[in-house]
């Protein structure tokens, strides 16, 4: 029913992949051989180990904190100089940009990356280069919001529209084409075919083989970069670097140093934010008054960390965690606690924001609304002081919409009514809680707080509703109930089976998977220029969709273990 809340719910194989003129450095992504004792590998391990030691052990720092910061800035400046030096031949920066983004350190190089990709986009369609280069160019441009037409891949197709034999054993190129295909939008038949062909062909090439290269390919197929939250892609990427056995360019070593220091800083930042979140939740006191409701501040702040990933947005993440926590609590009130009559009154109170109407409600509902009012007022005052605009009305309306959607589902369950799939999804997109959370995120980012933009966000635009559809349907693919929930309600799968008599569960689940794929295509399209929203907000919408699969990785007890959540930080 609610956001973030579940209801019912060997080497020989690849030897032909590298043309003689292929770049030899690592991340082209897969080496021809893996030698964990190679000099290059030993050097890379040493870089990572020494940087970590210098940061984590004060007695082994270069001299003092200033020295470490100086070296960090020196490495950043070195990379910026390389990117700027290639300004007349921007395509030479593509591999470096891919590495920077894969390591999650693009915050330091935003201007240089934007300038490079903009220049490449202005050059128009480029059909020259091998498959890997073409697909990489396509992916990087689309990630930045540039609409590159799929016709760029015409040279790899034969006259019948199939893929030419020359690319069928190009593992490096096929892998990059697979990654690029995940940014396709509706109506792109060439990329639909590329996704199906590369997935099948790469599995075929890897069949019966055991190697690190195979493992990395299989990880890419299971977790394509575009649909995977950044923290996991950077960890996977660093792991690849550590065991790659090739001579890599000097700039890669500089990037590794930057990434390692950033990683250590981020861990410290995260620990501080989590400490503040736990303190806030304890002082709020809801855990005592709404005893059966979930108390999971670690999980709630994990969502905020993944949605707003810029390290400079600590205050915004802490504030976003607060409404996320209330989504969970109110969801449990509707699912577990409340009688239908009480839920109807509670919804009316939220809709009118009427404190007087609380008198007839039980204490846990009164306390919950008071917490909701306090959080909404706190956020509104902060935004008004910072930006001169009062978001109170918009925030209250989002809570009213959520509660009304919860109430609809409560009535369905109470009466035994199983809605049509269309009815279910129309309401489910709202009851997912994604719209409410993304409205808060938009306001907290403080970008373009104009009447027109806020009204657009309030209307649950495609960039938000697509992400909500992904969450709702992912939720319903799960067969387990969320932890600590005694209540139940219908799922899309149940509605489908009821509406399409004779269908099997497998057929229903296949249908759901197809709808998720279409929702991703719509979300991809919404994030391309011209987009009415900032890149930071577009990325936040992508991030919430990327985070969904992670938050449904339950253990045997249908819980998200704390250690698992900590590993995501």
UniProtKB/Swiss-Prot annotation:
Kindly list the biological process annotations in GO that this record carries: monoterpene biosynthetic process; terpenoid biosynthetic process
Organism listed in the record: Arabidopsis thaliana (Mouse-ear cress)
The UniProt entry, under SUPFAM superfamilies, shows: Terpenoid cyclases/Protein prenyltransferases (SSF48239), Terpenoid synthases (SSF48576)
Q: Where is the transit peptide?
A: 1-39
- Which cofactors go with this protein? Mg(2+); Mn(2+)
Record key words, sorted = Chloroplast, Lyase, Magnesium, Manganese, Metal-binding, Plastid, Transit peptide
Q: Where is this motif: DDXXD motif?
A: 331-335
Name recorded for this polypeptide? S-(+)-linalool synthase, chloroplastic
| Tissues expressed in | Predominantly expressed in flowers but also in stems and siliques.
Cofactor note as given: Binds 3 Mg(2+) or Mn(2+) ions per subunit.
Pathway noted in the entry: Secondary metabolite biosynthesis; terpenoid biosynthesis
The UniProt entry, under InterPro entries, shows: Isoprenoid_synthase_dom_sf, Terpene_cyclase-like_1_C, Terpene_synth_N, Terpene_synth_N_sf, Terpene_synthase-like, Terpene_synthase_metal-bd, Terpenoid_cyclase/PrenylTrfase
Give the UniProt family note.
Belongs to the terpene synthase family. Tpsb subfamily.
Residues annotated for Mg(2+) 2 binding in this entry:
331, 335
- Which Gene Ontology CC terms are recorded? chloroplast
Q: What is its main location?
A: plastid
Q: Name one GO molecular function term.
A: magnesium ion binding
- Domain remark in the UniProt entry: The Asp-Asp-Xaa-Xaa-Asp/Glu (DDXXD/E) motif is important for the catalytic activity, presumably through binding to Mg(2+).
What does the UniProt function comment say about this protein?
Answer: Involved in monoterpene (C10) biosynthesis. The major product is (S)-linalool.
Q: Which residues bind Mg(2+) 1?
A: 331, 335
The UniProt record gives the binding positions of (2E)-geranyl diphosphate as 294, 331, 335, 472, 475
Enzyme Commission numbers on file: 4.2.3.25
């Amino acid at each position: 029913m609610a956001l973030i809340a579940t209801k019912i719910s060997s080497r020989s194989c690849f030897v032909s992949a590298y043309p003689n003129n292929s770049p030899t450095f690592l991340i082209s992504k897969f080496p021809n051989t893996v030698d964990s004792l190679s000099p290059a590998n030993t050097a890379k391990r040493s870089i990572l180990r020494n940087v970590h030691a210098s940061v984590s052990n004060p007695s082994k720092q270069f001299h003092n904190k200033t020295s470490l910061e100086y070296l960090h800035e020196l490495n950043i400046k070195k990379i910026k100089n390389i990117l700027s030096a290639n300004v007349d031949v921007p395509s030479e920066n593509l591999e470096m940009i891919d590495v920077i983004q894969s390591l999650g350190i693009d915050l330091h190089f935003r201007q240089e990356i934007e300038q490079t990709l903009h220049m490449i986009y202005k050059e128009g369609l480029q059909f020259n280069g091998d498959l890997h280069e073409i697909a990489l160019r396509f992916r990087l441009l689309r990630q930045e919001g540039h609409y590159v037409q799929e016709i760029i891949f015409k040279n790899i197709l034969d006259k019948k529209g199939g893929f030419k034999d020359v690319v069928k054993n190009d593992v490096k190129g096929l892998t990059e084409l697979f990654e690029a295909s995940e940014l396709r939008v509706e109506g792109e038949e060439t990329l639909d075919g590329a996704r199906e062909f590369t997935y099948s062909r790469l599995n075929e090439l890897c069949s019966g083989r055991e190697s690190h290269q195979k493992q990395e390919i299989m990880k890419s197929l299971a977790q394509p970069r575009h649909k995977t939250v950044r923290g996991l892609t950077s960890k996977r990427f660093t792991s690849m670097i550590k065991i790659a056995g090739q001579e890599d360019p000097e700039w890669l070593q500089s990037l590794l140093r930057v990434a390692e220091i950033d990683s250590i800083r981020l861990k410290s930042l995260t620990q501080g934010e989590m400490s503040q979140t736990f303190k806030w939740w304890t002082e709020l006191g809801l855990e005592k008054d709404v005893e059966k409701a979930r108390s999971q501040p670690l999980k709630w702040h994990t969502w905020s960390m993944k949605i707003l990933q810029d390290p400079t947005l600590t205050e915004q993440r802490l504030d976003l965690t607060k409404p996320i926590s209330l989504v969970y609590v109110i969801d449990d009130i509707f699912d577990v606690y409340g009688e239908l009559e009480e839920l109807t009154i509670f919804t009316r109170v939220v809709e009118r924001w009427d404190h007087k109407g609380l008198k007839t409600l039980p204490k846990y509902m009164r306390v919950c609304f008071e917490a909701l009012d306090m959080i909404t007022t706190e956020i509104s005052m902060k935004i008004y002081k910072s930006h001169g605009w009062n978001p109170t009305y918009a925030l209250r309306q989002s809570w009213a919409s959520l509660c009304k959607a919860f109430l609809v589902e409560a009535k369905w369950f109470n009466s035994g009514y199983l809605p049509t799939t269309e009815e279910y999804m129309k309401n489910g997109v709202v009851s997912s809680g994604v719209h409410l959370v993304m409205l808060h995120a938009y306001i907290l980012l403080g970008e373009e707080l104009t009447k027109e933009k806020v009204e657009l966000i309030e209307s649950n635009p495609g960039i938000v509703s697509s992400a909500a559809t992904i969450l709702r349907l992912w939720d319903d693919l799960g067969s387990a109930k969320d932890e600590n929930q005694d209540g139940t309600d219908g799922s899309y799968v149940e509605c489908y089976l009821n509406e399409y008599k004779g269908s099997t569960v497998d057929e229903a689940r296949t249908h759901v998977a197809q709808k998720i794929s279409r929702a991703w295509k719509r979300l991809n399209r919404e994030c391309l220029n011209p987009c009415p929203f900032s890149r930071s907000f577009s990325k936040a919408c992508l991030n919430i969709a990327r985070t969904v699969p992670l938050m449904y990785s339950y253990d045997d007890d249908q819980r998200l273990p704390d250690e698992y959540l900590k590993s995501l930080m």
